[in-house]
Amino acid sequence: MPIVKDTLRATVRVGYDGRVTKQFRGPKAEERFDNEVKVLRHLNARGCPFVPRLLDADAEQLKMVTTNCGSRVEHLDDARLRELFAELEIYGVRHEDVEMRNVTYRQQDGRFCLIDFEFATILPEGK
C-alpha cells in the first residue's frame, strides 16, 4: 500500500482498492484519532457528500479506514476555499484548519472535498 503522507502526526496510505488508511501517532494521537472518528461519524450520519465515509476505526491501533475523496488540490481561489469550508458548517462542523492541504478533488463527480478532521469541532445544534 503506497504511502501518500508520512508526518510526525500520521501515516496515510491508499490501498489498491481505493480505501485510505490513516495511522495516528505523535502528540495527542489518541485524542486526535477520537476526534476525527467522532466528526466523520457525525458528518456521515448527516449525509455530508464531500467528506470521506468512515469504513472502520480501530482505537487500539489508532487506525481508521475511509473512502478516498480524490487527489490533492494545488490551486483554488481564496473565496472558493472559504466557501467550501463554510459549507461544512451547514452539516454542523467547523474544520478549524482552513488550508489547501485539506482539500481534494473527486474526479468521478467533479466535487471538491474536505479531509483531515482531527482538529475539527462539532457545533452546537442550531448554529
Place the predicted regions along the sequence by residue:
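Activation of the activation-loop gatekeeper triad in protein kinase-fold domains
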Residues: 115-121
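Conserved structural core of kinase catalytic domains
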Residues: 29-32, 41-84
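Acidic active-site catalytic centers that drive phospho-/nucleotidyl reactions
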Residues: 36, 97, 116
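Conserved hydrophobic "DFG−1" position in protein kinase catalytic cores
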Residues: 14-15, 23, 56, 65-68, ...
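Catalytic-loop of the protein kinase fold
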Residues: 90-106
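ATP-binding glycine-rich loop module of kinase domains
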Residues: 1-42
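Short beta-strand-loop-alpha-helix junction that forms the active-site gateway
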Residues: 25-27, 70, 119
